Amino acid sequence: MTVSAAVSTVPDRVPLTVFDGSRVRVVLMLDIRDGTQAEVLDAYERMSDRVAAVPGHISDQLCQSLENPTQWLITSEWESAPEFLAWANSEEHLEMVRPLEPYVRGTHSMRYSVLRETAEERAGAGAAARGALQPRPRIGDNVVRHAVTYTVKPDSVTEVVKILSAYTSPEVRVDDTTRLVRTSLFLYGNRVVRAIEVRGDLQAALRHVARQPEVRAVEEALTPHIEQDRDLTDPRSARLFFTRAALPAVHHVVSGRGTGGDTQRCALYYPAHPGAGPALARLLARQGEATVGDPGSPVVACTVFHRDDLVVRLVDTAGAPERAPGAVLALHEPDALAEAGRLLDAAALGADGPPDDRALPTFLAHARMRPLTDRQSPAS
């Protein structure tokens, strides 16, 4: 058994993090069209060199089912989750895999942190140098978190608020193992953020939601108001839009103290200076762990969503967030405040300057997003 010397320690109350230093194994299952096996092999060979040059990529394999020649998979290994996510949610990714599109009926992607591996002794040193292996698995509750974000035309904000505040909720049951748990919608200026929680299979839930007539009606009503051109009847246009809109969850922490009837949910918007988004997301994840771990903190759970230079935190608090602005912002420590001051684009928030102890209540007001809807399924 090969075990890395670099061992990360993730608290038991963190069911999700991409910041633990683990390598990532991605399995992409492909259902290809009958008779296109040779074309799939040729397409893979044409794109493989480009994928191999992506930062963080270690290796990949193209595999064909022993039993069914139309079932294939691509398995790849990456140095870290942030590097993989940066590529997977990019337009560059869509362009690279385009040669496969004509031959694929459907896909299913699964992403895993590498916990342990067995290797020959002579390979041990090389494997040990590639990322951390975790001392124990993360413990979770089978809930997957994801978000999408997009901007609407400034003169359409009022109409968009009406559409998103009054839509009919879709059927929460997806299948025997998957159901929608919670959907929270927020607005900051003309930016919409939709955060969803799913018990079970996220991809199955997203496909289920997209097929629901009430959701299709809402999306059709929104299309003329969105700044990015999109045609949801065109699979390529829809794929491009939702790739650009993806705002993946990169960290989640829960207190384990339970939630009472006065629990409130708020969303906070953290625009970063160019290139500072990853560092800001790491800082807020680290500080969020400390805040939730404090028995005196009102924060009972928080999730960090990150893409490029945009970070959004979803925070559940026992009582009003205004009672503890530093804890809610995850900026309650002097060192964290100083680091955030270097990373945050305070001007984009309309703030006079970087956050400091005295200005935290005002900074919370600047960062707080406008809630539109927050819907939970009855069984959740």
Swiss-Prot record:
Xref: SUPFAM superfamilies: Dimeric alpha+beta barrel (SSF54909)
Domain of life: Bacteria
Domain ABM: start-end pairs: 24-115
Similarity annotation: Belongs to the SchA/CurD family.
Protein name, per record: Protein SchA
Organism whose genome encodes this protein: Streptomyces halstedii
This protein's encoding gene: schA
